[in-house]
């Protein structure tokens, strides 16, 4: 595995606020993608009381080659999860929350109803908190993402992850054009919802392929794109091709804005929910 360049070295997670956030998460039996996916930004985000909550358990039914989340046979759904989540958000005094999940291909609706219950429960307890969701593709789960769109999260995020050529290797159980269809339909069903998608680089894609993904996302009327460096979690995961330089990320940002995205986050440490509250405020200012 390649040694990390200086620009990818994040501070170790420490501090009083970090520990308070950790304690609240554990107290309410919540999982976070920050921990499960070993996010490099956990120290910075948790010290700001920003955490991305992962619902539907901590075990995924897929095994994408880039992802560090555990795979296998998941536990049954926790019926108290939506209420526990809402209570934790109130205790953390979050102005903006990001909710994601593992894939649950074992469930008839892929877990869509749990997303909806979380949205409803949060709005019962704290109506001022804006809600961003990051969902799986709900492949072959008819009506699943459509129902979530009707529930009106403030932001609907679904990550395209990589270029079409690399799907068979990186996301073997996903379909590129289905993900585009999901994003396009969410916007058609509920035009008030901001749509967002993310892309990893450093997996062997070309610049031309990245520009084509940008065009495809704009054709689906996606408002916001995130572009970040792929970091290989373990030697068993998809091999890192190279580290993309900060200057290249700036170039991608320039190109993405020129193609019509309302907001672009593009840097080595950019992740789907990194600076999500600040970026949501930027989105609102564009409308």
Curated annotation (Swiss-Prot):
UniProt catalytic activity: [[Fe-S] cluster scaffold protein carrying a second [4Fe-4S](2+) cluster] + N(6)-octanoyl-L-lysyl-[protein] + 2 oxidized [2Fe-2S]-[ferredoxin] + 2 S-adenosyl-L-methionine + 4 H(+) = [[Fe-S] cluster scaffold protein] + N(6)-[(R)-dihydrolipoyl]-L-lysyl-[protein] + 4 Fe(3+) + 2 hydrogen sulfide + 2 5'-deoxyadenosine + 2 L-methionine + 2 reduced [2Fe-2S]-[ferredoxin]
Name of this chain's protein: Lipoyl synthase
UniProt: [4Fe-4S] cluster 1 binding residues: 34, 39, 45, 273
Family listed: Belongs to the radical SAM superfamily. Lipoyl synthase family.
KW RNA-binding (keyword) present: no
Domain Radical SAM core: 46-262
InterPro entries on file: Aldolase_TIM (IPR013785), Elp3/MiaA/NifB-like_rSAM (IPR006638), LIAS_N (IPR031691), Lipoyl_synth (IPR003698), rSAM (IPR007197)
Signal sequence, start to end: none
Gene: lipA
Superkingdom of source: Bacteria
The keyword 4Fe-4S is assigned to this record: yes
GO MF annotations in UniProt: 4 iron, 4 sulfur cluster binding; lipoate synthase activity; metal ion binding
One Pfam family in the UniProt entry: LIAS_N
Pathway assigned in UniProt: Protein modification; protein lipoylation via endogenous pathway; protein N(6)-(lipoyl)lysine from octanoyl-[acyl-carrier-protein]: step 2/2
Binding-site positions, [4Fe-4S] cluster 2: 60, 64, 67
Protein EC: 2.8.1.8
Gene Ontology cellular component list: cytoplasm
Subcellular location as annotated: Cytoplasm
Record note on cofactor: Binds 2 [4Fe-4S] clusters per subunit. One cluster is coordinated with 3 cysteines and an exchangeable S-adenosyl-L-methionine.
Keywords: 4Fe-4S, Cytoplasm, Iron, Iron-sulfur, Metal-binding, S-adenosyl-L-methionine, Transferase
Cofactor(s) recorded in Swiss-Prot or TrEMBL: [4Fe-4S] cluster
């Amino acid at each position: 595995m390649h040694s990390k360049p200086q620009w990818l070295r994040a501070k170790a997670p420490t501090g009083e606020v970090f520990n308070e956030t950790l304690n609240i998460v554990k107290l309410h039996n919540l999982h976070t993608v920050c921990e499960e996916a070993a996010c490099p930004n956990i120290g910075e985000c948790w010290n700001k009381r920003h955490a991305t909550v992962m619902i539907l358990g901590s075990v995924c039914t897929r095994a994408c080659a880039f992802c560090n989340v555990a795979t296998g046979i998941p536990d049954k759904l926790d019926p108290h999860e939506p209420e526990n989540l809402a209570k934790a958000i109130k205790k953390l005094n979050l102005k903006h929350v990001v909710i994601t999940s593992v894939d649950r291909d074992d469930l008839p609706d892929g877990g869509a109803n749990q997303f909806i219950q979380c949205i409803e429960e949060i709005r019962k307890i704290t109506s001022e908190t804006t809600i961003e969701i990051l969902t799986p593709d709900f492949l072959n789960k008819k009506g699943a993402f459509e129902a979530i769109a009707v529930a009106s999260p403030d932001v609907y995020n679904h990550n395209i992850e990589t270029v079409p050529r690399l799907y068979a290797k990186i996301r073997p159980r996903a379909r590129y054009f289905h993900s585009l269809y999901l994003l396009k339909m969410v916007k058609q069903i509920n035009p008030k919802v901001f749509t967002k998608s993310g892309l990893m680089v450093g997996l062997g894609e070309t610049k031309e392929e990245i520009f084509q993904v940008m065009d495809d996302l704009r054709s689906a009327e996606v408002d916001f794109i995130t572009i970040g460096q792929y970091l290989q979690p373990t030697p068993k995961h998809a091999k890192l091709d190279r580290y993309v330089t900060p200057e290249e990320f700036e170039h991608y940002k320039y190109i993405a804005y020129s193609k019509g995205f309302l907001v672009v986050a593009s840097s080595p440490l950019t992740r789907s929910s990194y600076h999500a509250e600040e970026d949501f405020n930027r989105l609102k200012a564009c409308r």
